[in-house]
């Protein structure tokens, strides 16, 4: 039965049916401090990682772009800065996060290139072969069914379109893995005490084992 399927939320095993609601609840709780949380957790490196990701994009003139799990619209902003004729569909399952992204787009003057929509990456409300580029940064781990989400992204891509996914993975170097685990369990929770009313859940939502 579908309701008996299990998935991971951080290091916790939960029912697949519960994951999307858990993810939505976590990001409701951290929305106001989301950018600060990311800066603390990555030591500011997440901005460099996103920039490096987008340097891989090969786009035609006037590209149509879909960004999934957009958060506060970091990736759409970077895309529009480098491709000012781009039209970007900015999506997230969390309306609180999406509202922050919309406000940022207004304040930083890239709103005219964006359309904001509350939507799940596992059930995209777009026709086949719509986008030249689909991007997702640090969001795939929070999908309940990652294969379903990836198939949806592929469905929405035009022929010769590109999918760019930025995500954590398990370190291949055993020494680095020990350092990373120590950082995850000792440093991250303390950082999140200052940014989230529920630091444990926020930490779980950002750990690579969710992927």
Please report, for each region that a protein language model flagged, where it lies by residue.
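N-terminal auxiliary segments of SAM/dcSAM-dependent transferases
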Residues: 1-24
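Conserved alpha-helix/loop element of class I SAM-dependent methyltransferases that forms part
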Residues: 33, 43-61, 78
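Hydrophobic beta-strand segment of the Class I
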Residues: 34, 134-135
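Class I SAM-dependent methyltransferase SAM/SAH-binding core
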Residues: 64-123
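A short acidic, Gly/Pro-enriched loop at the edge of an enzyme's catalytic core
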Residues: 122-133
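A short glycine-rich, Lys/Arg-flanked "PGG" loop and its adjoining helix->strand segment in the class I
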Residues: 147-159
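Conserved class I S-adenosyl-L-methionine
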Residues: 162-190
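Single conserved hydrophobic/aromatic residue that forms the stacking wall/gate
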Residues: 194-211
């Amino acid at each position: 039965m579908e309701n008996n399927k299990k998935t991971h939320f951080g290091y916790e095993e939960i029912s697949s049916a519960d994951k999307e609601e858990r993810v939505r609840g976590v990001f409701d709780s951290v929305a106001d401090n989301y950018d600060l949380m990311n800066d603390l957790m990555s030591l500011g490196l997440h901005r460099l990682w996103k920039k490096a990701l987008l340097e891989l994009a090969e786009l035609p003139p006037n590209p149509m772009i879909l960004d999934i799990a957009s958060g506060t619209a970091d990736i759409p902003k970077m895309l529009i800065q480098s491709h000012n004729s781009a039209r970007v569909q900015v999506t997230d399952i969390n309306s609180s996060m999406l509202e922050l992204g919309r406000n940022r787009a207004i304040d930083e003057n890239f709103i005219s290139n964006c359309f904001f929509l509350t939507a799940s990456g596992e059930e995209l409300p777009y026709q086949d072969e719509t986008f030249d580029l689909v991007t997702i940064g640090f969001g795939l781990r929070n999908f309940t069914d990652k294969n379903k989400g990836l198939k949806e992204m592929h469905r929405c891509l035009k022929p010769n379109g590109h999918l760019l996914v930025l995500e954590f993975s398990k370190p291949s170097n055993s020494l680095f893995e020990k350092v990373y685990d120590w950082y995850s369990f000792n440093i991250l929770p303390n950082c999140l005490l200052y940014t989230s009313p529920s630091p444990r859940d926020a930490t779980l939502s950002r750990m690579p084992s969710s992927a």
